[in-house]
Amino acid sequence: MERMGLNEIREEYLKFFESKAHLRLPSFSLVPKNDKSLLLINAGMAPLKPYFTGLQVPPNKRVTTCQKCVRTGDIENVGKTSRHGTFFEMMGNFSFGDYFKKEIIPWAWEFITEILKLPKDKLYVTIYEDDDEALDIWVNKTDVDPKRIFRLGKEDNFWEHGLGPCGPCSEIHFDRGAGEVKTSEEFVKASDEDKIVEFWNLVFTQFDKDEEGNYNKLANPNIDTGMGLERMATIMQNVDTIFEVDTIKAVLDKVCELSGANYKEDRVKDISIRIITDHIRSITFMISDGILPSNEGRGYVLRRLLRRAARHGKTLGIKNTFLHNLTDIVIENCYKNYPELEEKREYIKKVIKLEEERFDETIDAGMQILNDYIKEVKNNNHKVLSGDKAFKLYDTYGFPVELTEEILEEEGISIDKEGFNKEMKEQRERARSAREETNYMGSEDTILNKIDLNINTDFEGYDKLEVKSKVAVIIKDEEFKNGMEKGNEGVIVTYNTPFYAEMGGQIGDTGIIYNDSFKAEVIDCKKNISGKVLHFVKILDGKVALEDQVILKVNEERRNNIRKNHTATHILHAALIKVVGDHVQQSGSYVDDERLRFDFSHFEAVSEDELKEVEKIVNKEIMKANAVNTKVMNIEEAKEQGAIALFDNKYKDDVRVVSVGNFSKELCGGTHVSNSGQIGMFKIVSEAGVAAGIRRIEAVTAFKAMEYVDHKNNILKEAAQILKCNEKELLNKLNHQVLEMKEKEKEIEALKLKLASGAEDEILNNIREIKGVKVASAAVKDIDGNALRDLGDKIRDNMQSGVVVLGSNYKGKVLFVAMATKDTVAKGVHCGKIIKEVATIAGGGGGGRPDMAQAGGKDPNKLEDAIKTVETVVESLVK
């Protein structure tokens, strides 16, 4: 057995199965497509599920891949052990109803003994206890020693996940110090002790488990194998852990260089070194696939990994941002197999650095708060931090709850997770997050995805708006039907169509389907998971049946408006790259007949001057009346010509390229104008941030742009009429009015302050004494926060010793302020606690220091009641 690098192992595996007539596919994105059950791709076969389930036709019956994967289920163990990691690559070869056991078993043995040259006396094989077929092949079609084959039960060697396809599996293992093993019991014991490690699982999907628990034979059994690349590398490089594998150790060595720490000298430091080494790999690949840090979904997973790694950097004494520098090491070791890493290197580093800087801004304040919480919990002899406090750290200071848990665990404290989840649920109800858009209709198990794969629905709508066809499928009430009649709503599928189905951000077409005996309105048009075009219809007249000849006609005016907006989006994209920078990448878009929306990567607001320049460039390209051309070409040729591809899309070998003159060139399957002049006019309506590092521009074109400009002009005219000036004088007139208003406001505030000062004597005359502490409290009217604090200062200074609590009803909101002298604080008075109790009654909250605090409230009607509680609260605090 010769030492082999990780990248070499990957290439040898893929080459081997290419030699067995397999199609080599590049790794799919970590972001699952059309699978809402997964947050991130976590297994080699996960992106191939539609092929196994028959929902899509595979590009070849034999496929081989090396799939990047992220798993965070046992993240708390990453770093603490040298075995666990979040990022890994899974090599696999797959058969979709083609070859089966008699092919894969000999191939597997050939690869590991002849290509990898693993010593046969170090290999063990396990099979399912009832799988005599697999045993026969292992014994008679390979030269494995039969004594090294063990039969194991369902728990170890049978793959199933609920109902549906399942089957036995055969695993191949390597002896890493067990010595000779003679029985299955000895084998299991050695495996549990990691003296024997499994490195390749061959799954024979040959059954379909039904609801009664029966295992029915599949007509076309499948093969699904998985070999962990990093684990295989530990064997080929004769190292004990993944952190000693060549490509991963390069990252670990850089962590040690940046921190000045030596690996394997300090157990605590080793944990931090391993966490950073592992997490930066996941972080780099996740960002390269278009994921950005956020507080939801996969973005939260990324933020959690990034901030956990950053925190452990500080534990190692690394003071400045550093993770973005580690990205270079990851990319240098991976870019040959993942060229997108090199293409997006600077973007990935910028996202990481920005998130590190944001975390740096909050971590010190957050750690101070957390340390205060820890002291409070320990002083009260408690072992649990309340959920609302953990949520505050998460919501205000950006601390992932798992990071808070990790820090608390070091102090022997846990979190009230139920309380935290309650706070999280309430926040989500207050601000419901946007649902992720999908490119197909419905979930995988809907009837829309059960349409016969042999039915083709050819799209002819690039150059036709009306075609003749036959009805291939009718669906109504979640059932396949032979026909529909007037008043029914459902789905019609035809063999060809001019209707564009919603895809790539472009909304679906509408129109009509008709013949002499029926007419249906097409309300929407989408695709199912296998790409069939679904016409969502309402039958307006007559009846329609399967195989009826029909005419399909797209709403031409609506389609033309969509075309204008889609082509304008391409020009906008190119203009943004020119003005804002070449780091701009599309992260989402929406195009309909009224407007366009474009989301793109950028790390700050686009300035007004930049927006004006972008708008000017887009309109200039429109006025040039550039020809818009489409051409189908090889993906590599398209890239060589500089065509822009979507961030995380996987493309076929041949792609459609849309060019607008020499200004814009993008891979796109949408519909476009034939000449940029047809767009007419372009106007930006808004620019805003929608997520960390993502900006959104909304714009209108053609007549909608004219309407927008007319509306703005009408507002200017009306404003000029109100101010009794012409439009040229409007700004000067407005500035003059604003200055006058500010002067009046100052006069009003001065009068209010004078009135408040008049209330000072009355408040001082009503001081009470509670347990030796003087208390002044009152509700005053129409005083803002500054005036309220000034009044509080005067009363406290007059009292010389005591506590003052004031409340004000100002512009429909309640304001509170509390102040205390040092001697009363020494007696137990705490303004932060007082103000919190008082403000709660008025529907608000707040806090502060022992000697000064302020708060707000929502219910002015409760102001008097809130002030009345001051004495009771003070009494409870004074020692």
Swiss-Prot record:
Cofactor needs: Zn(2+)
Cofactor annotation comment: Binds 1 zinc ion per subunit.
Reaction catalysed by this enzyme: tRNA(Ala) + L-alanine + ATP = L-alanyl-tRNA(Ala) + AMP + diphosphate
GO MF term list: alanine-tRNA ligase activity; aminoacyl-tRNA deacylase activity; ATP binding; catalytic activity, acting on a protein; transferase activity; tRNA binding; zinc ion binding
Residues engaged in binding Zn(2+): H566, H570, C668, H672
GO annotation, cellular component aspect: cytosol
EC number: 6.1.1.7
Cellular localisation: Cytoplasm
UniProt record, GO biological process: alanyl-tRNA aminoacylation
Signal peptide residue numbers: none
Keywords recorded for this protein, A-Z: Aminoacyl-tRNA synthetase, ATP-binding, Cytoplasm, Ligase, Metal-binding, Nucleotide-binding, Protein biosynthesis, RNA-binding, tRNA-binding, Zinc
Cystine connections: none
PANTHER family reported in the protein's UniProt record: ALANINE--TRNA LIGASE, CYTOPLASMIC (PTHR11777:SF9), ALANYL-TRNA SYNTHETASE (PTHR11777)
UniProt free text on domains: Consists of three domains; the N-terminal catalytic domain, the editing domain and the C-terminal C-Ala domain. The editing domain removes incorrectly charged amino acids, while the C-Ala domain, along with tRNA(Ala), serves as a bridge to cooperatively bring together the editing and aminoacylation centers thus stimulating deacylation of misacylated tRNAs.
NCBIfam families linked to this entry: alaS (TIGR00344)
HAMAP family documented for this protein: Ala_tRNA_synth_B
Homology family: Belongs to the class-II aminoacyl-tRNA synthetase family.
Protein name as it appears in the record: Alanine--tRNA ligase
Gene label: alaS
